[in-house]
From Swiss-Prot:
Keywords: Cytoplasm, GTP-binding, Nucleotide-binding, Protein biosynthesis. Signal peptide: none annotated. It comes from Xylella fastidiosa (strain M12). GO terms for molecular function: GTP binding; GTPase activity; guanosine tetraphosphate binding; translation release factor activity, codon nonspecific; translation release factor activity, codon specific. Belongs to the TRAFAC class translation factor GTPase superfamily. Classic translation factor GTPase family. PrfC subfamily. This is Peptide chain release factor 3.
């Protein structure tokens, strides 16, 4: 067996998705704790304390206690290499989250036991559906009062349209929480509150009939549990690996991330059943992970991960072959070989140089402006990975400068932040305005904050009469030129040089489409098929 085949089989690359405040970042920490990657978990709640959550590393995130950039963390567990991608928890950062989901092979959905399925969870589930991503579910905050577990399973099935297969089942909830029972092994894991900051294994009974269990949880609770389990095992589906891998069934676990409870059964099950790196579609063929030659795509660019060095790092998912430190790779978009020196692996913002990487791994490439989101690297073959889109923004603002002498820094900052996916940046053909587009209001706050902190630019954003944007394309260059002349006041170029129609109203957009039937108007732009505009 080749090294690439063996190492690919060891990899598990996944993302954690949830509605804000479902406890995703806390669970991330506990997974790292069990993987031995960190010794002590930092409570996300202690926002003003010395210890902040390991995966919330940007200053703004530490101040607000929310994740607004995606972190990448790698740790070993039970002979496997786990690549965990933490996604932005705030609703405004959907696009960044979507691109993270293009780089993983499976996902873990976190649901708050008291709130059930929330709006953000529904949207993220739709994204996972597009690629049939296998999903496991962790119902969190079991140490608090919440919805009836049977009702929760019904809600997940009804709202998200995916079959539930419970793997662990709660014994009580809130103040009455006594533990969980594993429905596949019959093991009972007892809940011991207060042991939440260091790695711990709960007391385990081998079955519901084990001596001493009734004394620990109470005769009545044990009797109620037997009754409930009969009901749930009769009414719910059994775990089916094929259905799970096809994205049609989700194994469900219950626990409390903040108390470190129920996390280890989840991690053990994940390592055993989650898919290793899968094949990937490109514009020309399917790439298998076990191929010997390196391929990979960039799904994220992060500026200024190290404020002392003002650097930019491109996050590349390795799709096939083996990456070795300092190797040259073919950058398909520019048709040039680039030396991938000093590539990094991550523990959030802690970085280490990487000697080699295999399919499923995410590496950081130092980027001086030549690499963009969606770029493909190979060992010479011309191909581009598909399924890495940009979405048309819903909110627009004009950037205004307090100090006109800082225009150059503002343009540089906006260009870099748009390449990173923090915002979209448009330059109208007929004016010198700098227009920003976003999917949520928080993005403008983040951009203003980062412009000031990282580029020394004080900028304000004022409303502008734009309702939506569409990327425009036409096979016939003469027709496209005529369209440009007639609609020049509504046209702009984005940070990649693509032509974009900025519509003041939906009616205006509809009229423009009716008047130019040969022009294609796109609400998303696929990076693999990006078309340059002069």
């Amino acid at each position: 067996m080749s090294e690439v085949v063996a190492e690919t089989a060891r990899r598990r690359t996944f993302a954690i998705i949830s509605h804000p405040d479902a406890g995703k970042t806390t669970l991330t920490e506990k997974l790292l704790l069990f993987g031995g990657a960190i010794q002590m978990a930092g409570s996300v709640k202690s926002r003003k304390a010395v210890r902040h959550a390991t995966s919330d590393w940007m200053t703004l995130e530490k101040e607000r206690g929310i994740s607004v950039t995606s972190s990448v963390m790698q740790f070993p567990y039970e002979g496997k290499i786990i690549n965990l991608l933490d996604t932005p928890g705030h609703a405004d950062f959907g696009e960044d989250t979507y691109r993270v989901l293009t780089a993983v092979d499976s996902a873990l959905m976190v649901i708050d036991v008291a709130k059930g399925v929330e709006e953000r969870t529904i949207k993220l589930m739709e994204v996972c559906r597009l690629r049939d991503t296998p999903i496991m579910t962790f119902i969190n905050k079991l140490d608090r009062e919440g919805k009836n577990p049977i009702e929760l399973l019904d809600e997940v099935e009804r709202v998200l349209g995916i079959q539930c297969a419970p793997v662990t089942w709660p014994i009580g909830m809130g103040k009455r929480l006594r533990g969980v029972v594993n429905l596949l092994t019959n093991e009972v894991h007892l809940y011991e509150p207060g042991r939440n900051f260091t790695r711990q294994d709960s007391t385990i009974f081998t079955s519901l009939e084990a001596p001493g269990l009734a004394e620990r949880i109470g005769e009545q609770m044990l009797a109620d549990l037997h009754e409930e389990l009969e009901l749930i095992q009769g009414a719910s589906a059994c775990f089916d690996p094929t259905e799970y891998l096809g994205g049609r069934q989700t194994p469900v676990f219950f626990g409390s991330g903040v108390n470190n409870f129920g996390v280890q059964p989840l991690l053990d099950f994940f390592v055993e059943h989650a898919p290793s790196p899968q094949q990937r579609d490109t514009t020309s063929r399917v790439v298998l992970p076990t191929e010997e030659k390196l391929t990979g795509f960039v799904f994220k660019i992060q500026a200024n991960m190290d404020p002392q060095h003002r650097d930019r790092v491109a996050f590349m998912r390795v799709c096939s072959g083996r990456f070795t430190a300092g190797m040259k790779a073919f950058h398909v978009r520019s048709s040039k070989d680039l030396k991938l020196a000093n590539a990094l692996t991550f523990m959030a913002s802690d970085r280490e140089s990487v000697a080699e990487a295999f399919p499923g791994d995410v590496i950081g490439i130092h980027n001086h402006g030549r690499v963009s989101i969606g770029d493909t690297f190979t060992e010479g073959e011309v191909l581009s990975f598909t399924g890495i889109p940009s979405f048309a923004p819903e909110l627009f603002r004009r950037a205004c400068l307090g100090d006109p002498l800082k225009l150059k820094q503002l343009q540089k900052g906006l260009t870099q932040l748009s390449e990173e996916g923090a915002t979209q940046f448009f330059r109208p053909l007929m004016s010198n305005d700098l227009i920003l587009g976003a999917v949520g209001m928080l993005q403008f706050d983040v951009v203003a904050y980062r412009l000031k902190n990282e580029y020394g630019v004080d900028a304000t954003f004022e409303p502008v009469s734009i309702t939506t944007a569409r990327w425009v394309y036409c096979d016939n260059s003469k027709t496209l030129e005529e369209f440009r002349e007639k609609n020049v006041t509504n046209l702009a170029v984005d940070a990649s040089g693509e032509l974009v129609y900025l519509a003041p109203t939906r009616v205006n957009l509809q009229l423009a489409q009716e008047r130019a039937p040969e022009i294609h108007f796109f609400a998303t732009r696929e990076h693999a098929y990006a078309v340059g505009v002069d």
